[in-house]
């Protein structure tokens, strides 16, 4: 099973980390039923300078909203954070309790997909 917005949200929820999903300016408890949310991420990064088409960005540490400037135009697919950045980017957000733990889980899923 590839890492998509839906599988990432399910994984984070199963581990008690997911608080909310922000999608199309709506807050919800799960990813809506939209085929576009089943497109696999091309990469996971926590460095905004490396975001490219299809990237999942994990916002951790001393992350600042201004780091997100221009990322929609570079292909940001979604972000994981403990803060809502929907005022800065259009990409869906997975709001979690601990972005570092979330990074560990989704990175493992990308490198070792579930069967």
Segment roles from a protein language model:
Residues 1-109, 113:
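N-terminal leader/targeting and accessory segments in enzymes
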């Amino acid at each position: 099973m590839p890492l998509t917005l839906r599988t990432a949200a399910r994984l984070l929820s199963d581990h008690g980390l997911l608080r909310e999903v922000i999608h199309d300016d709506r807050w919800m408890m799960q990813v809506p039923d939209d085929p576009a949310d089943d497109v696999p991420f091309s990469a996971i990064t926590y460095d905004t300078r490396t975001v490219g088409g299809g990237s999942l960005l994990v916002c951790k540490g001393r992350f600042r909203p201004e780091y997100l400037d221009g990322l929609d135009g570079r292909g940001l697919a979604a972000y994981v954070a403990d803060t809502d950045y929907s005022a800065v980017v259009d990409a869906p957000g997975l709001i979690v309790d601990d972005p570092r733990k979330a990074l560990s889980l989704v990175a493992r899923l990308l490198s070792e997909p579930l069967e």
